[in-house]
Each structure stands twice: as structure tokens, then as C-alpha cells.
């Protein structure tokens, strides 16, 4: 188990005078199952991109962990190929047998890897890409809205799958998914981030209690 330490993180988009984050500090363990909670447009995706090193910032983010992000960006050229042909472009060094093991946990056949990606349903594509994501070793995973545009059956499958995993930050508007899959909450406030133990419902109950006493 390792940790991710964020210290005095400050970030502002170029041309903006209002910081997205200002002097944010916290630490999390890399085997936690974190749900990232906050209103739309308040910086969740920005923070994930900071972890991925896409933007410059002041302060520090220190960890021995390697980050990987879902959903992967699939090019038009890759859409015409089988996933087995471009797995290494998404996750270099990933072994196919590990992906096949993950697909079994997602209740789908390994045969999906050998069909043109564009012929797969949205749910099948999601499951293939999640299998690739979790087939690596020692990665800390950033999972952004994995159940978007999926039917109820696929959402339930992914909920069961993620419930057995650890070492991730999950961004989702699906409260049922968050309740089932997380053991800690990252709460995005106006310009800060706080960490609480528990799932979405326990955080919501605590928030309502604090709001009530603040009146």
C-alpha cells in the first residue's frame, strides 16, 4: 500500500482570475475505494487531469503510484480494428490473458476482443475497456462515469465488478453505484477537497446533519 499526498495544490486556468483549487492538501491510501463528489463544473475532471500530469500547477502531488484513466480515448482508426490489436496502445505491456480473466468477471466472452470494436454495443465496449484498465498491476485508477449510457443489466454487472476492486477514484452520478463500491469520499468544495470515510449515503447524512445544526 502506498499513499498519494497532495500539498498546497493551487490551480487556475490560463486567463482566469478565479482558482479552481487553492492551497488544497490531503492524503489518501492507494488501496482505498474513493468516490469523488461535487457539483458539475466544479473541478472533478480538472483534478483527475492534474493527477495525470496534463496541467501545470503550484504545490505538489507526490506518490509512487502510476495513474490510468477510464474511459480510454478510442480513435476512429482503432474503432475499425479488434481490441486485441490495439490493447498495447492503450495500456503498454498489458497481458491479454489478464484481460480475459477480467472479462470473465464482467460476465462477457473473450470473443469480444477479436471483433471489430465498432461492432460492439456500448455496454460491451465499456466492459472491454474496464477489463483493460484493471488488467494492469500497481496502477491507481481514475474512473470517470463508467455507467453512462448503459442499460440496467450492464450497470448492475459493473456495480458488482467494481465492488470487488480497490485502488481507484470513481466519478459517478449514480448514487447506488457509489454506495455499493466506495469506502471513502473525496468531497469537492468551493476551492478545496476533503476526505471522509464511508460511502455516498453516510456522507449525505453527515452533510444534512451539519447543515441542520448550522441553521
Predicted regions and their residues:
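ABC ATP-binding cassette signature C-motif
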Residues: 1-214
Amino acid at each position: 500500500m502506498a499513499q498519494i499526498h497532495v500539498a498546497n495544490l493551487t490551480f487556475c486556468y490560463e486567463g482566469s482570475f478565479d482558482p479552481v483549487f487553492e492551497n488544497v492538501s490531503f492524503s489518501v491510501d492507494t488501496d482505498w475505494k474513493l468516490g469523488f463528489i461535487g457539483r458539475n463544473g466544479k473541478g472533478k475532471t480538472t483534478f483527475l487531469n492534474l493527477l495525470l500530469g496534463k496541467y501545470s500547477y503550484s504545490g505538489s502531488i507526490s506518490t509512487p503510484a502510476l495513474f490510468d484513466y477510464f474511459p480510454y480515448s478510442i480513435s476512429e482508426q482503432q474503432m475499425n480494428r479488434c481490441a486485441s490489436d490495439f490493447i498495447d496502445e492503450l495500456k503498454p505491456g498489458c497481458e491479454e490473458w489478464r484481460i480475459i480473466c477480467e472479462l470473465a468477471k464482467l460476465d462477457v466472452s473473450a470473443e469480444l476482443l477479436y471483433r471489430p470494436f465498432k461492432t460492439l454495443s456500448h455496454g460491451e465496449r465499456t466492459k472491454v475497456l474496464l477489463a483493460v484498465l484493471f488488467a494492469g498491476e500497481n496502477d491507481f485508477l481514475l474512473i470517470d462515469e463508467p455507467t453512462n449510457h448503459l442499460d440496467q443489466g450492464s450497470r448492475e454487472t459493473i456495480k458488482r465488478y467494481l465492488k470487488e476492486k480497490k485502488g481507484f477514484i470513481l466519478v459517478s452520478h449514480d448514487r447506488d453505484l457509489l454506495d455499493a463500491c466506495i469506502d471513502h469520499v473525496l468531497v469537492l468544495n468551493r476551492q478545496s477537497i476533503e476526505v471522509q470515510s464511508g460511502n455516498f449515503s453516510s456522507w449525505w447524512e453527515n452533510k444534512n446533519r451539519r447543515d441542520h445544526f448550522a441553521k
